[in-house]
Amino acid sequence: MSELHLLSTQQLITGLQDKQFSSLELTDHYIKRINALDSKINSFITHTSETARAQAKAADEMRVQGDKRPLLGVPMAHKDIFCTQGVLTTCGSKMLHNFISPYDATIVTNIDKAGMISLGKLNMDEFAMGSDNESSYYGAVHNPWNIAHVPGGSSGGSAAAVAAGFVPVATGSDTGGSIRQPASFCGLTGIKPTYGRVSRFGMIAYASSLDQAGSMGRSAMDCAFLLQPMIGHDPRDATSIKYDMPDYVQDLNDAAASAGDKPFAGLRIGVAKEYFSKGLDTEVEQAARAALKKYEELGATIVEVTITDPEITLATYYMLAPAEASSNLSRFDGVRFGYRCENPKDLIDLYTRSRSEGFGPEVQRRILSGTYALSAGYFDAYYTKAQKVRRIIIKDFEDAFANCDVIASPTAPTAAYKLGEDLDPATMYLGDVYTIGVNLAGLPALSQPVGLTSAGLPIGLQLIGQYWQESKLLSTAHLFQQHTDHHLQHSTIAKETV
């Protein structure tokens, strides 16, 4: 029982179904670990332990009565960007430090319906703006592999909680790499689905045309289990798209069952030289190329493709995302909800002080740059031009996929750096250089672990797919994980028993 947290989601499901342990015992095991060890990591903002224990007892009773839902009684946790009725929902910001959501986000409702048990809300970069989880009002999150290092961001709390063995899976959101980059830094698998695949209703907006929710776990199969209840059309989200509903878990099982000695025979993996250029750490490049060689040994064909220069993509993203943020975050004014300054002199003072005191430096920086890009005289020169470049980025991906089935790249140019090391915003922004193009194009992508640095820090490989091809991405990673053990390595904190 002391190592329940090291089991995969499939093993947890089997254990619950075979009565090897109860949902209450499993939930208590995770709660005990969180209480004992999260002081080192700071992955949770809000704990919902008592509610979780009540839900676990109910799940055990429902299983006795014949409830066959596979995820019934399996614990998880939500990134604190998803509204949760009756529970503090902060988005990592002082602006929302007292906000109790009056409703559930659609994915929260869907995961509840699947029978999963939420252990709480997870730390994150403030309003999802950051790549290291150091901008949270609730303090920095520490990487479970080495607590002196960052876990990545903005879903750093989600990644750290899974890597530490506090939950088997967690939700995240990805605007420019916020699932994939922390998955890479924490040795996890994390997937950002096609834009429109998962409802954004109840997910606090950063950049509406880029935001997408996804799942994080140690393996592709873990991600598939959590992603399954998250997907589906939602009429309350205008960007939600009606499309075929795949069974990800079945797709992965079918792929494994039909795989021979060369499971990737016929698979064309595109590799762009633009992803292996200046700024890429030597150890990261070596691990990525070794993973590609393994894919090749297992039957895949590596083909060279061309995509938009990542530096152009980076500039485009940091023009469009802050512009959308400046609009989305204008609702936080100290009047309707959120932080309100004390004793304002007048209405203008209320607005000014509430926002300057309620938002942290990184959020203010992006609001200001976005407002500048949208201002009269600069709109056409910056915002409109960036939207035109976005179309070129999409076209370049379309052209690349004419010659390959998936595109592979390093997830991030480096492994996790030390806390406080990357204080220069421009340097931090470069950490997203390989991931943001996917969001601009609305494509699905995942990160999978492919090795460790000499310092013992995880390295991730990104796989990018065509629209609606999450099953192909997950199956590709799953089959790779059948022949490697990178996803089976555990962090320093996960190895600790309590």
From Swiss-Prot:
GO terms for biological process: translation. It catalyses: L-glutamyl-tRNA(Gln) + L-glutamine + ATP + H2O = L-glutaminyl-tRNA(Gln) + L-glutamate + ADP + phosphate + H(+). GO terms for molecular function: ATP binding; glutaminyl-tRNA synthase (glutamine-hydrolyzing) activity. One of its GO terms (cellular component) is glutamyl-tRNA(Gln) amidotransferase complex. Keywords: ATP-binding, Ligase, Nucleotide-binding, Protein biosynthesis. It comes from the Bacteria. The active site is at residues 79, 154, 178. Its EC number is 6.3.5.7. Heterotrimer of A, B and C subunits. Allows the formation of correctly charged Gln-tRNA(Gln) through the transamidation of misacylated Glu-tRNA(Gln) in organisms which lack glutaminyl-tRNA synthetase. The reaction takes place in the presence of glutamine and ATP through an activated gamma-phospho-Glu-tRNA(Gln). Belongs to the amidase family. GatA subfamily. PANTHER family: GLUTAMYL-TRNA(GLN) AMIDOTRANSFERASE SUBUNIT A, TRANSAMIDASE. This is Glutamyl-tRNA(Gln) amidotransferase subunit A. It comes from Psychrobacter cryohalolentis (strain ATCC BAA-1226 / DSM 17306 / VKM B-2378 / K5). The lineage of its organism: Bacteria, Pseudomonadati, Pseudomonadota, Gammaproteobacteria, Moraxellales. The gene is gatA.
